[in-house]
């Protein structure tokens, strides 16, 4: 008989019991998000979902994303209750820009050592995001990988599938000179630019936990969950049929994201003085001495979603969005691009 001790998975740093305890805690979260098309609950090898009734030529739309280094800030602040909302938002906002209704969502949670309480907070946030977007949390993977992550540090990825009627796909092909650009406000930096944000905090030496802006703790402003625009935008599409293009303003800001939905020869002319930039962006710019152009190339600067409609549809679109609880702005229009011109022109940039 060997004198070597009998090794278990737990000795190697993987706690199967903790994983099972987490699954039990999050079953109710998944149940709250259930859509009628979803067949069965958590625990199967694969999640089954029917195409919703009423579609003539349904097209499935998929997307995947993470939350970037906002996660590092969440870990540093030990704030895990809303990062799951960010994860869902980053995926579903990308789907809705082509007119798709999100159907189901899966998450991937990888960690060095599973903290069941932390993971349950994260997944509860994912469930809240799914409820806000009307999509079903159908499964996920929790991977405990000792030696791959430091301690209880974790990483997140989300995967979402939606559906859109083939004849109603929004792809920007009908965008024309003279069209108007509307915008929906962001809640803050959302889930992009956090490597710059963290560098600004580091270089400035700011104690972000003691600073207040406009009466709100700076940590709350930096960690505010990414807004989920799905329900108001689906209502806008359904009630008006006027949406020609939409751009989710993520990494790359207005400068890199609007061109993704513009046809060749079109230029977006955006007046940056047409909306009130939240104080958190001014604080970041000042503390990091960040160039104004760089601000708009990295951060959303207060705009989370841009919508293109014909000029004669502006008032109707604004009305529908306001009725849905949004506070939209008209921020610019589409022009014919001059030879060699950038696809986005920002007017009234602050001198810095």
UniProtKB/Swiss-Prot annotation:
Query: Mind listing the GO molecular function terms for this protein?
Result: ATP binding; phosphoribosylamine-glycine ligase activity; phosphoribosylformylglycinamidine cyclo-ligase activity
Q: What would be one Gene Ontology cellular-component term for the protein?
A: cytosol
InterPro entries membership: PurM-like_C_dom, PurM-like_C_sf, PurM-like_N, PurM-like_N_sf, PurM_cligase
Localization in the cell: Cytoplasm
**Which Gene3D superfamilies does this one have?**
PurM-like C-terminal domain, PurM-like, N-terminal domain
**What reaction(s) does this enzyme catalyze?**
2-formamido-N(1)-(5-O-phospho-beta-D-ribosyl)acetamidine + ATP = 5-amino-1-(5-phospho-beta-D-ribosyl)imidazole + ADP + phosphate + H(+)
Q: Which GO terms of type biological process are on file?
A: 'de novo' IMP biosynthetic process; adenine biosynthetic process
Pathway in which this enzyme or protein is active = Purine metabolism; IMP biosynthesis via de novo pathway; 5-amino-1-(5-phospho-D-ribosyl)imidazole from N(2)-formyl-N(1)-(5-phospho-D-ribosyl)glycinamide: step 2/2
- This protein's record includes keyword Nucleotide-binding: yes
Query: What's in the keyword line of the UniProt record?
Result: ATP-binding, Cytoplasm, Ligase, Nucleotide-binding, Purine biosynthesis
Q: Which domain of life is it from?
A: Bacteria
User: What is the E.C. number?
Assistant: 6.3.3.1
User: Where does it primarily localize?
Assistant: cytoplasm
> Is Metal-binding one of the keywords?
no
| Family named by the database record | Belongs to the AIR synthase family.
* Entry-linked NCBIfam families: purM (TIGR00878)
Question: What name does this protein carry?
Answer: Phosphoribosylformylglycinamidine cyclo-ligase
- Look up and give the organism this protein is from: Pseudomonas fluorescens (strain ATCC BAA-477 / NRRL B-23932 / Pf-5)
Taxonomic path: Bacteria, Pseudomonadati, Pseudomonadota, Gammaproteobacteria, Pseudomonadales
